[in-house]
Amino acid sequence: MTKKEVGHNFLARLGKKRLRPGGITATNWLIEQGQFSKDSHVLEVACNMCTTSIELAQTYGCSVEGVDRDPKALEKARANICEAGLDELVHVQQANAMKLPFPDDSFDIIINEAMLTMLGDEAKIKAIKEYLRVLKPGGRLLTHDVSFTEERMGEQLASLRQTINANVEPLHVANWQKLFEEQGFSSVKLNYGKMTLMSIPGMIKDEGFWGNAENHLQRFEKRKSSAISKNVPFL
């Protein structure tokens, strides 16, 4: 991994498809809350290479719009969509979560994983307000981010930032709930568990055994900071 390369980009170069803090366990829990069907119109914000969007379309036959700011990730996403034969159901475009290119009341469900944590306080509010704007009345927001369960986590936060080489801004579990409720969301349901994104067991659970990538992952494991071993939870 280069000095300035963000951790999840490094993992993507090694072939990792699930770039989420709580891995497939957290994503599956979110999807269970979504009540997806073939009639659902879904938006995935920060879709990356569209692993989740593709699985949703394959499983439920729903239509999915994906947005991401990274043109390289979107290039991979388009290739993955084409390979899966889902060009009619899954579409992607470059866009900013704080200024979504969709009309009001467009979507039944929004899924957003591992992005709000990357934003500062004001940007979080702007993004969440945009989600509320483009959701239909009664729509659902499914979000998967990093949270803390203890009040004082300054040292662990510094270690986490160093580990993934990004200035992340996770919140306490209670503060995440307060943030969503203050922006107009109701019936906020929370779940949290261990952060598995950059652990070898988590990678194996998410992706299976990787063959040629295994040695690279073992070398990366040695570089981890203590933040990962402290079980920083996901929201």
Language model features with spans:
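Class I SAM-dependent methyltransferase SAM/SAH-binding core
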Residues: 43, 49-99
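C-terminal helical/coil "lid" or tail adjacent to the Rossmann-like core of SAM-dependent
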Residues: 191-235
